[in-house]
């Protein structure tokens, strides 16, 4: 089980990313627009740098919803491979069966 602080830090990053998503997208659009003047470009760049580091979507780590494990995350089910195996063998994931040939 990972430290609670790591899980809470990730939750904070998710919250910050959602909170600043619109502003970040607006500034990125200004930077991507080729018709932007130099003053507007550098102004948008400065504002983007002033946003919190953790408000960037890239800094969010996918974690297992049951155990909090950050590695071997299966996105379709939202759990790690270990939890996925336990749930699948217990028959708690509909449509998932153990392969046999």
From Swiss-Prot:
Belongs to the universal ribosomal protein uS14 family. Signal peptide: none annotated. Gene3D superfamilies: 1.10.287.1480. The lineage of its organism: Bacteria, Pseudomonadati, Verrucomicrobiota, Opitutia, Opitutales. One of its GO terms (cellular component) is cytoplasm. The gene is rpsN. Keywords: Ribonucleoprotein, Ribosomal protein, RNA-binding, rRNA-binding. It comes from Opitutus terrae (strain DSM 11246 / JCM 15787 / PB90-1). Part of the 30S ribosomal subunit. Contacts proteins S3 and S10. This is Small ribosomal subunit protein uS14. Binds 16S rRNA, required for the assembly of 30S particles and may also be responsible for determining the conformation of the 16S rRNA at the A site. Pfam families: Ribosomal_S14.
